[in-house]
Amino acid sequence: MMNILIIGPSWVGDMMMSHSLYQTLKTRYPDCAIDVLAPNWCKPLLARMPEVRTALTMPLGHGKFALCERYRIGKSLRNQYDMAIVLPNSLKSAFIPLFARIPLRRGWKGESRYFFLTDLRANKRDYPMMVQRYVALGYEKNALPSAQDLFIPQPYLQVDREQVAQTKELFALQFKQAEDHPAVGFCPGAEFGPAKRWPH
């Protein structure tokens, strides 16, 4: 069995997009186990992604460098993983897999990470959408399809009937509509540019 550590993103939309990567990994490596290191608030999302074995809490806040703490976390993860995939582009996000001595460390070029990642991807322009970049990391370099040929599994969350009923009841109260009335929400925008917007 291949054990994979994902250094997850810190934003809800990015975390949802990362589910396409987890599905890709499970298709390519059916027996793999995927653990995701991410902020604590991500645990409820990750718990609803069936491909994720464990959601590990990243105790450091977004933007905190804290090299000694990153070393401690990395050391605690030694001898547990065969591959790490680093989704954020920051230099500091590549430290934990390095300190964990994970042999295959894959990610996109960013912030001088040349010596920290063993499988560095440099052709970001060929994959203009963030979800394409995430899914591309599920492939070895020599097997990587072009962006046009890249299959992107749709992200989804597993929910149970009780939760659906509770949500319908809550929406019915809040928006004064019948519980059996369909409700649809769309969030096509992005705060920081076109890479994360829905295609149009």
PLM regions: where:
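Catalytic machinery of carbohydrate-active enzymes
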Residues: M1-H200
